[in-house]
Amino acid sequence: MSLAGICRRHLVAVGILGASLVGAALWLHSLWIWRGFTEYRMERDRDIPTAVAVGPDGAVWFTIDFADAIGVLRQDRIQRIQKGSENFEPLGLAVDRDGSAWYTDGPSRLISRMSPDGAVASFALSTPVAKLARMAAAPDGAVWFAEESTYSFTRLKDGAFTRHAVSTPGIAPFGVAVDASGAVWGTLPRANRLVRISARGEIAEFEPPTRAAQLGDVAVAADGAVWFLEMQANKIGRFAKGQFTEFPVPTRSAGLTALAIALDGAVWFTELRGQRLGRLRDGVITEFPLPQGDARPFGIAVDGAGNVWYTDLSGGLGRLSTERARGR
């Protein structure tokens, strides 16, 4: 299935798990605890947590599909903050150095920023239709996002948009990340390309060894290595010093949807169909089955302490503890 197909097929409502006890699991109101996992269930049955990002203050932000709100978890309490318009496939989310959450709002043709106190500032796109994918915050205070409707990687800084069109006509971008030097990395799923945009705006493209791999999310490690998902090929890819390395995921047709890098260098990813989180460390992939039988892990982020956060399309926000994440 194509990247777009996976996103659209699974961004639909599924049932909320009823209150029950499973083994050593503990259910406390909307809190579920089991073997290093903690899951916070959504209070509204229709809420579908989608993208997730962690701020410098430890706040965990997440978008909610088919809702007019953004969610944030602080001190084990979820707040549902109204934003004024309903989300549809809210795939873009990033938290800047000041702790403000930036998010894409395709139906309203906006890029918006929500400050820690909930104040919203929005910046209108000039296109009649806006189809938007992933987003990343840059060290210089800019935010970048993949603008599928204009086939561009777009920068927003001080209220001004700058578009960098991809060289292959009609090919929509998806993943986006910014490295420490300010260079932007992105993915072109249908073209099977990894893209680099230099600080001067020069664009270079690189093709991984596996054909038709369908590159998805992308992230840059502290050592400068670029990591990305190969959704169709069911692999995790690495690009460093001009060379590609690919790591097959043990679970077949896992449904790779999101990627994040921990401070210790471990690469974390979600397996939507496999109902697992995956960790790639020192060339070895370890999988962590989620505690709920109907789990659909979609977004992923790692906080400064090493806790791994993920969204569950079945209606939850989850955390894998640092101790469990760094173990075995």
Q: Regions from the language model: what does each represent?
A:
Residues 48, 66, 89, 107, ...:
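Beta-rich catalytic cores
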Residues 2-21:
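N-terminal Sec-pathway targeting helices
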Residues 41-45, 82-86, 124-128, 165-169, ...:
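Surface loop/turn motifs at the tips and blade-to-blade linkers of beta-strand repeat domains
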Residues 60-66, 101-107, 143-149, 184-190, ...:
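Conserved beta-strand positions in repeat-built beta-propeller and related beta-rich domains
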Residues 41-68:
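Beta-strand-rich domains and repeat architectures in extracellular enzymes and scaffolds
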Residues 296-328:
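Blade-level signature of beta-propeller repeat domains, shared across WD40, Kelch, NHL, RCC1
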Residues 54-57, 95-98, 137-140, 178-181, ...:
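Residue-level detector of Asp-centered blade-edge/turn motifs that repeat once per structural unit
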